[in-house]
């Protein structure tokens, strides 16, 4: 018996990830079949970052499988006070599975190294695996397979890293990355070079104009964007100058009607959206159902992840 955690996709084979996606599809189609699948199981959710989708999807997800959840904010916990390893080990004595949405990747790694129950990374500075499983589920539903062309335009961040990791691992479809902005993550050149070597990640010139990028967009199935400013900084006065500099640099890369004109692609965004910044209101209006399908699929993907980890 080897207990699995999901910090990112490193510990999973392509077949295992496909099994999770197929299970998620079945759970979505036949919820009654799984209504007691995790009876009596206890999920602990810990939030250092703000959340709408991660909180709702995990808590409704475990409930739909017959389990219960216990939610705590990082600032209200004693993780902020003392030696964290003993706190982690204590939590594990009370619950069956843990999901934490944390600011730093190193804190997620600390959990991964010390838990005695399965642990899920609900998002950190470097990876967002559950979001990408929801994206993959949505791709399968809308296109029938993972063999799609996806163009990501925006910051090289946790969502982008996990997208690249997923496409490279699955060896299906291709992600084209236009990332003029690089956020602070642990994924260095080796990570991206290895992904490029699979042929399933194409790094576009980050100085490319949107006119040039538009030529690529015409052939895409999906155009994907994400916030340019991390959500914990968006309304932070101390971050005001850096935010303004970032927005000024990135405004030419907005996903708007002019850019999407002539492309058959649907638009993905992992939410929350900042209309008028990374995406225009018109593009949101046209693609809102796709974006909401993507967001709803967080719940189904995470149900499959929890079930898989608890039965690994």
Regions found by a protein language model. Give the residues of each.
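Positively charged, low-complexity intrinsically disordered leader regions
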Residues: 2-56
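Phosphate/diphosphate ligand-binding glycine-rich loop within oxidoreductases
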Residues: 36-140, 275
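Phosphate-coordination loops involved in phosphoryl transfer and adenosine-cofactor binding
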Residues: 37-43, 146-148, 172, 264
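Glycine-rich phosphate/diphosphate-binding loop of Rossmann-like nucleotide-binding domains
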Residues: 48-60, 141-225, 231-233
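Short, structured coil segments at secondary-structure junctions
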Residues: 65, 94, 114-116, 171, ...
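Rossmann-like adenosine-cofactor binding region
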Residues: 196-282
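Adenosine-phosphate binding glycine-rich loop
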Residues: 264-312
């Amino acid at each position: 018996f080897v207990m699995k955690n999901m910090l990112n996709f490193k510990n999973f084979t392509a077949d295992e990830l496909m099994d999770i996606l197929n299970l998620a599809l079945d759970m979505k189609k036949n919820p009654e079949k799984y209504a007691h699948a995790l009876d009596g199981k206890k999920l602990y959710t810990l939030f250092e970052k703000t959340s709408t989708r991660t909180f709702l999807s995990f808590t409704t997800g475990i409930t739909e499988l017959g389990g219960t959840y216990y939610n705590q904010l990082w600032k209200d916990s004693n993780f902020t006070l003392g030696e964290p390893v003993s706190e982690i080990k204590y939590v594990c004595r009370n619950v069956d599975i843990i999901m934490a949405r944390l600011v730093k990747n190193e804190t997620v790694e600390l959990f991964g190294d010390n838990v005695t129950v399965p642990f899920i990374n609900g998002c950190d500075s470097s990876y967002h695996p559950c979001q990408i499983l929801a994206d993959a589920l949505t791709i399968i539903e809308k296109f029938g397979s993972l063999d799609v062309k996806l163009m990501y335009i925006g910051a090289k961040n946790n969502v982008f890293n996990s997208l690249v990791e997923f496409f490279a691992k699955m060896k299906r479809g291709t992600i084209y990355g236009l990332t003029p902005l690089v956020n602070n993550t642990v994924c260095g050149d080796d990570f991206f070079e290895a992904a490029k070597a699979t042929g399933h990640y194409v790094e576009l010139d980050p100085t490319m104009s949107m006119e040039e990028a538009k030529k690529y967009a015409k052939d895409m199935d999906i155009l994907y964007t994400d916030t340019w400013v991390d959500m914990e900084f968006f309304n932070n006065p101390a971050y005001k100058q850096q935010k303004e500099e970032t927005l000024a640099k990135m405004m030419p890369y907005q996903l708007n009607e002019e850019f999407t004109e002539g492309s058959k692609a649907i638009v993905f965004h992992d939410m929350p959206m900042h209309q008028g910044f990374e995406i225009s209101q018109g593009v949101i209006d046209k693609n809102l159902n796709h974006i909401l399908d993507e967001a709803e699929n967080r719940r189904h993907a995470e149900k499959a992840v929890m079930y898989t980890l608890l039965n690994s």
